[in-house]
């Protein structure tokens, strides 16, 4: 198809910035960016612009002047969070004791998905048993859920801000023989 693609994967903002700087030095034509964090991208985007490299954001927004990138193809993270909370409310549970597994703090996805749950906790009586970052990581999510299980704290909902963290949560539930799903001991 005439295109050559290079790829760098990291969930850490500093590593992403380093990779982006290398792509700029390599003289790529386009830089597609799904940033782990919303901050810290101004100098990279200016360098890309100065080098004539078009930047396209996808999956997540960043805190930068819109003139520094060509396009942004992103989800409405706040709406995603509200949709998840609305679904939880539709389950009509007698109580909501929630383990909240957050993504990378400060990312657009984390902020949007957390905001809706925080509002529900403040206005609808949702009890946040714990609210911790698992940084989009299944293993960290499993450790957090296992810690709550081991503590004996009562919970019946796990609100995970991405699929990998939900998988980690389910692994902890399975290990403890706790049923999960709609109509089970824990809704994930």
Task: Locate each region found by the language model.
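A residue-level marker of the well-folded mature domains of exported/periplasmic proteins
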Residues: 1-188
């Amino acid at each position: 198809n005439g295109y050559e693609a290079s790829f760098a994967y990291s969930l850490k903002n500093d590593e992403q910035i380093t990779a982006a700087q290398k792509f700029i030095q390599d003289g790529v034509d386009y830089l597609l960016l799904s940033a782990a964090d919303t901050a810290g991208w101004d100098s990279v985007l200016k360098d890309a612009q100065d080098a004539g490299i078009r930047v396209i954001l996808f999956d997540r927004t960043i805190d930068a002047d819109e003139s520094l990138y060509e396009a942004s193809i992103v989800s409405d993270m706040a709406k995603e969070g509200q949709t998840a909370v609305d679904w939880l409310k539709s389950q009509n549970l007698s109580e909501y004791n929630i383990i909240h597994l957050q993504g990378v703090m400060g990312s657009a996805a984390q902020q949007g998905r957390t905001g809706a749950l925080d509002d529900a906790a403040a206005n609808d009586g949702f009890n946040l048993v714990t609210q911790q970052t698992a940084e989009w990581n299944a293993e960290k999510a499993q450790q957090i859920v296992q810690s709550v299980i081991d503590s004996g704290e009562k919970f019946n909902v796990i609100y995970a801000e991405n699929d990998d963290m939900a998988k980690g949560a389910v692994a902890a539930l399975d290990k403890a023989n706790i049923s999960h799903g709609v109509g089970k001991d824990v809704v994930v």
